[in-house]
């Protein structure tokens, strides 16, 4: 059964401790959360208590590649304690996608971490923005990256893929066996800015058909820069709930 979550980066401007933010999420219909950087500085016991009292599951965690390389043991210990077995590299700078050589270097780094994580019971995924969809070879840099790392999952950000000029539904169909989490975000492709879900250029109906056909497990709401994060939380939860 499909489950819904929010990427906590969307709520980073709420000036409350993370457990209090989780309590706000618990007031919605969302089933879980996708952690961002704040969890690394929070009281883990308090976070676990908040997850439990709000019946929220850890959908995944965004963790930088440098953080995984520099403190692998610390990162895996934290997320293991949180019961989070899916780690997602949320961003690599555009220079990583400029050429076949730079993509190969990024793939080598991601592949090494993915192998270590698999041995320790974790899955590694990569979350796109727009820079990954530059032309490369017979496809895009994103295609080349995924072709180079067999154990790398693809957390597709539907809105950023569309803003980059890619076809998010075709991507979901092509990589269905690697997409367990999909980011439902929206953007204005002309200005390359995030907007409320349903107000940008994303064809929500087509994307919903694609993720359903691919049996995507988690629908994750994200808005990079909402004017009102609490209202955005409610809007995201209600919209994803309507997709069940």
Identify the function of each model-found stretch.
Residues 1-5, 10-26, 78-84, 119-123, ...:
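Histidine-acidic metal/acid-base catalytic patches
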Residues 1-80:
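N-terminal pre-domain/capping segments
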Residues 8-9, 33-35, 61-63, 100-101, ...:
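Short, contiguous strand/loop micro-motifs
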Residues 10-12, 39, 64-67, 93-95, ...:
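Active-site-proximal loop/turn and secondary-structure-junction residues that shape catalytic pockets
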Residues 32, 94-98, 192, 221:
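Short amphipathic alpha-helical segments at helix-loop
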Residues 46-53, 105-116, 206-210:
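Catalytic-core regions built around general acid/base machinery
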Residues 65-154, 230:
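Active-site acidic/histidine proton-transfer and metal-coordination neighborhood
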